[in-house]
Amino acid sequence: MVYNQDLSISNKTCGISDWLPPVRNKKISDIKSNSWFDIRRCLNPNIKTKFVPVNNKQIVLKEPNCIYLKYDLITLNPSSDHIRILREWFSLYAKIYNYAINLIRKMFYVNNKLIKSRLQCEIYDEIIIRKLSNDKTKLIESLKLSDRPPEFLLDYAISHACTYCNSQVKKYLKDSKNPYNKKTLRFRLWSLHKSRRVMHILPPKLCDKNVCNGLFLKLNPSKNIHDIYMFCVMSWDRLTGKFFVYKPVLKRLINIPKKQFTRCGIDPGVRTFLTLYSSERTYDVCDSTFYNNKIKRMWRKIDRINFLLHNRKKRKKRKNDRRLRKSLAKYYRKIRQRIKDLHTKTAKYLVSRYKEIYIGIYDTSKNLSDPRISFYEKRRIATLNHELFLTKLQQVADRFGSSVFAINEHMTTKTCSKCGRINEIGSSKVHKCACGMYAGRDENAAKNILKKGIKEHYLSAQSDKNVTEYNNKKSNNTNKET
């Protein structure tokens, strides 16, 4: 018998009940999320939760301290001549961005080998702008337009590339501390055939009459863009032909939702997107049935369109090729929007109910590179995108006064949450142990993540506090004796 020492703590010391929902005769109630997925809840019959009226669900702050950033969408309505100019600007922005990325790559890699001594150095915009000054002038002169882009717009592209590379280096240094993590440092280039393109702009500079003959003053925005004094993002969708500006707005948080419960543990997965456990109840978010009904159908349509576009014996351009590519982009966009809706609504639902959230780290890149996992399973992992959900959850938690802790979920599925024994369960949905514990696989893992989080962040801090108090008392007694 092998026991897990990290999880061999009793439930009583962690302040958790021994309850786990039964596998058979499980009383489940569906919670409507006003979206394409549902949340399934199972209540603990031993604990009676108090009914909270609607008026008491929010706390009104007298002095709001939390300030967060939000983006307002502004649509642009340019004429046909202006559309042609803006398209050239977007392609030029992408080219100079790729030039900067290639130059930064050469700084870190020599003969395809990473020089680790240069990782501590920060990449500065001014140095790379100086080095790419000749390339900038050549690219601007190559355009046949009368309204050529200003040089500072291309400088924004270089600074955009520098910030991206600095973030990638910081992420690599953080991940390299973990001995099990074998990720490489990558600086990705932008594809010039992307359906959606992005450009960083500063509206006060571009809205000047002397810049490009006052081009930005003639774009007919849906809202005023002259009062923006921060960097904002301008995007262009090639397939729909629409232009947008994302205006940053600072907002103060006035109401904070009251937290009904204290702690919970979350096990991210593929069959069910999230499985949550707390002493009072459990939640199952987005079961496989909802995924199959809503998203799997779209993937089938995407596969069919790709087959029509690429797998032909004699490839000839047809009239309906453009229509097929438009429909392909439409289905990709629908999947992206549905996953975004899933992430935002579940994050808000969890943060409004729990003070402390312990969530397991689901390594997407590791699972995608595993040869044992099938292609369709990998596709499902990539679409659900647990890493993106974790960042979204942390952002929403900072806004609403909750704390999120990312926990390593190593051996949490195999370990029994009652006795700490390690059992080989394989691919079964039920965890059965010799101690008499018979529960669902995901609920057991979520409970272990909760126990692990309490041990790491709560019990260890409490034990350190007790040790310091004991040492202080001991030193005081020795001083009195002397």
From Swiss-Prot:
An example Gene Ontology molecular-function term: DNA binding
InterPro entries per the UniProt record, alphabetical: Cas12f1-like_TNB, Recombinase/Transposase-rel, Transposase
GO biological process, one term: DNA recombination
Keywords linked to the UniProt accession: DNA recombination, DNA-binding, Metal-binding, Transposition, Zinc
Keyword Repressor: no
Binding annotation for Zn(2+): 416, 419, 433, 435
Disulfide bonds listed in the record: none
Position of the signal peptide: none
Similarity comment: family membership: In the central section; belongs to the transposase 2 family.
PANTHER family, alphabetized: PTHR36172, RESOLVASE-RELATED (PTHR36172:SF1)
Name this protein carries in UniProt: Putative transposase R186
